[in-house]
Structure formats: C-alpha cells, structure tokens
C-alpha cells in the first residue's frame, strides 16, 4: 500500500488557490464558434479531407506556420460523477466518505498533435484544462459510483466519440486508500478527429476498512483434540466399570471361601460328635436278634491290671489274685457281688431322654410309652436301658 502523504493547512490552501486560478484562466478564454466543427457537419470518413469542407468556410488561414491541433484520446472507463448536493446522511450505510484534500490516483493526461497542413502526428504529455478541472473537483467535491449519462456519443454507435475510436487502458487497482498511479503515453489508433482527449481513470469503488487479526488456531485441530479426549474419557469409564465388577466378584469369592471354611469346621464337629455317640452307645444291629447275641456269649478269662476300684469283689476258687508280695493265689470267693450304687439326681437325664423321644420317635403311641417309662425309672441303669431302646426304635 502506498504511503499516504501529509499536508499542512497552508499547503492545502495554496493548492486550492493555484487550482482555482488555473481553472478560471482557461474557462475565461473566448471560444470561436467558426474554429470548431459541429457534430452534424462531420460526414463519415477521414477527418483530413474535411479541411475543404467546414474549415474552408471559416476565417482564412494565416500565411504563417499553422499551429497544430490537439486531439483527445478518451477512454470508455466509467468515471465518477460529482455529488455536490448529496448530503452524507443520504449515502448508503457503511459507505466511507473519502477526504477530498487527499491526492487521488489520477493518470497524467495524454495528447496527440495533428498538423492539419502536413498531416503529421506527434505525441506528448498534456497537462491542460482537463487536469485543472480534475484538480478542482478533487479538492472541492466527493465522488460516487453513479455513471453519468453521456451525450457525446451517437445513439446508433455507442463507441463513436469525437476524436475517433475509443482507447481502453486497464489501470492497476489499488488496495485500501487511494494511491498514485503514474500515466503512460498511448499512441492513438485513429487519425481522425481534432478534439484532444484525456483518458479517464477507472472507477474506484468505496471500500470498507477491514481489521486484520492474528489467525486463530486451526479449528480442525481443536476438534480432533476434543474428540480424542472424549474417546479417552469413555475408555477410562469403561475400564473403571470393569474394575468395579472384578472387585465385586473377588469380594463374593472371598465370602464363599469363608463360608466353605465354616462349613468344613461344622462338618468336622458333627463327625466328632457322631463318633463320640458310637463309642458311648454302640447299640445292637437291627438285623441280629438279641437271642443270637446272648448265645454267642461265653465265659472268658479277664485280667484286671492294677488295683481295683472296689466296685466289685470276687468270690469262688475260679479266680486268681495277687497277694501283698505279688504272688498269685487262688481266691476263696466264688461269686462277684456288686456294691449298691449311690443315689444321683436323675432329673436332667430324664429331661434329655424325653426330648430325645420327642425328636426321634414319630408314632404317638410309642412316644407316650417311652415317656411313661422315663418317668417311672428310678436308677441310672434303667434310664440307660430306655435310651438304648429309643435309639433302636429310631433306627
């Protein structure tokens, strides 16, 4: 972007006065009506042959050298129209108003000199009335992009202009504010016409200022990172759920292990109790009668080691005992007499047997019979006999 020049107030005033003076100088010159050709008086063809037509009717040509006429080369680019009476509030919204005191990118004028007598064509720079008018308009007016209605052309041929065929020249567009564009000389493509022209600049549309900020991070990268984090979070939640299930299963396994240990201990206790019951009361097999068991009984020698408890005494000569000097001697006793047993409290044993009869005997009449016997028993041996009978009946 071209650097914007700065001017002081005094410099701006001087430029304005100089431009106005130049414009007034050229506008105040008299115009000779017979020295120019009218539009209707120019027939189709080469302009050089018209010197004998309309120019011949004008004032006589001086004998001195003829001053070359200048020909305008007009571009068909769309010029800006002057908007002196459009207030700012009636402009479109967000339309910036350029500063009329800033220099605009205007090309230098072009000129083509045609010698009417000799027909020679010369080119050079032209900085005349048109540039003065443009300077005044630049300093005092603002521009809009409305296209003016041109009356210089013909209705049948829009490309026809005074001075010959139009010449188009692409101008380089500027960026941002108006920049300076240097003009270039263009050779006329037509030898017709006597009116000098200046190429018009291309229209410069009003542009809105744009703020330039640093480019943010790529939205695609941010989206990928967020999706990756969401995926990791989902996988982490899945792993946590599986770990919780594993911990719950392990706790159940530990509880089962403890219960199995308790069951093993209980089974061992029951087995011990059953073994104790068998040792204390082996009873009699149900398939062997008592008479057969009694027949199998016969007398056998019995050896008692150690001192006797005094529960019984041996009588008769069929027993051998040891005296004080540990000598075996025949005993004079012939039979064994048992001493009377001491009386004991049998209430607890009776209650135990009653509970055993209620649990093991299912028939009511048998149960009542055993309960009557338990209540009538007076010795411990009778209660033991009743207990054996209850166990046999239960088996």
From Swiss-Prot:
Q: Which GO terms describe its cellular component?
A: host cell cytoplasm
Q: Name one Pfam family in it.
A: Soyouz_module
Q: Where is this region: Disordered?
A: 178-217
- Top-level taxon in the UniProt lineage: Viruses
Does Phosphoprotein show up as a keyword for this record? yes
Residue ranges with Low complexity bias:
206-217
Where is the stretch described as Nuclear localization signal (NLS)? Answer: 65-72
What are the record keywords, sorted? Host cytoplasm, Phosphoprotein, Viral RNA replication
Region annotated Nuclear export signal (NES) sits at 225-234
Report the locations given in the UniProt record: Host cytoplasm
Q: Indicate whether Phosphoprotein appears among the record's keywords.
A: yes
Mind telling me which InterPro entries this protein's record contains? P/V_Pprotein_paramyxoviral, Soyouz_module
Q: Where is it chiefly localized?
A: host cell
Kindly state the subunit structure of this protein: Interacts with host ARHGAP26; this interaction promotes host RHOA activation. Interacts with host KPNA1 and KPNA6.
The entry's family comment says:
Belongs to the rubulavirus/avulavirus P protein family.
The protein's job, in short, is: Essential component of the RNA polymerase and the nascent chain assembly complex. Also required during RNA synthesis. Also plays a role in viral growth by promoting host RHOA activation and thus actin formation via ARHGAP26 inhibition.
Task: Provide the protein name.
Answer: Phosphoprotein
Q: Which gene encodes it?
A: P/V
């Amino acid at each position: 972007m071209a650097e914007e020049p700065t001017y002081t107030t005094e410099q701006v005033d001087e430029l304005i006065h100089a431009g106005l003076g130049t414009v007034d100088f050229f506008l105040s010159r008299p115009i000779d009506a017979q020295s120019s050709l009218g539009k209707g008086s120019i027939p189709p063809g080469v302009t050089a042959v018209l010197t004998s037509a309309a120019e011949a009717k004008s004032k006589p040509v001086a004998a001195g050298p003829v001053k070359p006429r200048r020909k305008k080369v007009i571009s068909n680019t769309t010029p800006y129209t002057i908007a002196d009476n459009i207030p700012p509030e009636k402009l479109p919204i967000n339309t910036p108003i350029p500063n009329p005191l800033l220099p605009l990118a205007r090309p230098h004028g072009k000129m083509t000199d045609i010698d009417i007598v000799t027909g020679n064509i010369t080119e050079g720079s032209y900085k005349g009335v048109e540039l003065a008018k443009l300077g005044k308009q630049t300093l005092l007016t603002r521009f809009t992009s409305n296209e003016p209605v041109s009356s210089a052309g013909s209705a049948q041929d829009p490309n026809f202009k005074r001075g010959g065929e139009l010449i188009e020249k692409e101008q380089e567009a500027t960026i941002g504010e108006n920049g300076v564009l240097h003009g270039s000389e263009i050779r006329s493509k037509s030898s017709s016409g006597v009116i000098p022209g200046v190429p018009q600049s291309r229209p410069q549309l009003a542009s809105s200022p744009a703020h330039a900020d640093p480019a943010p991070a790529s939205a695609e990268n941010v989206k990928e990172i967020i999706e990756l984090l969401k995926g990791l979070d989902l996988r982490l939640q899945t792993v946590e759920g599986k770990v919780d299930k594993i911990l719950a299963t392990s706790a159940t396994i530990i509880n089962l292990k403890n219960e199995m240990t308790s069951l093993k201990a209980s089974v061992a206790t029951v087995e011990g109790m059953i073994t104790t019951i068998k040792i204390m009361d082996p009873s009699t097999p149900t398939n062997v009668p008592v008479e057969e068991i009694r027949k199998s009984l016969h007398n056998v020698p019995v050896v008692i080691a150690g001192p006797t408890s005094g529960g019984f005494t041996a009588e008769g000569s069929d027993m051998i005992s040891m005296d004080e000097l540990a000598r075996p001697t025949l005993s004079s006793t012939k039979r064994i007499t048992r001493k009377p047993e001491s009386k004991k409290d049998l209430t607890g044993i009776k209650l135990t047997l009653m509970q055993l009869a209620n649990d093991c005997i299912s028939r009511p009449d048998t149960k009542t019979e055993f309960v009557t016997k338990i209540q009538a028993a007076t010795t411990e041996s009778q209660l033991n006999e009743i207990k054996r009978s209850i166990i046999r009946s239960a088996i």
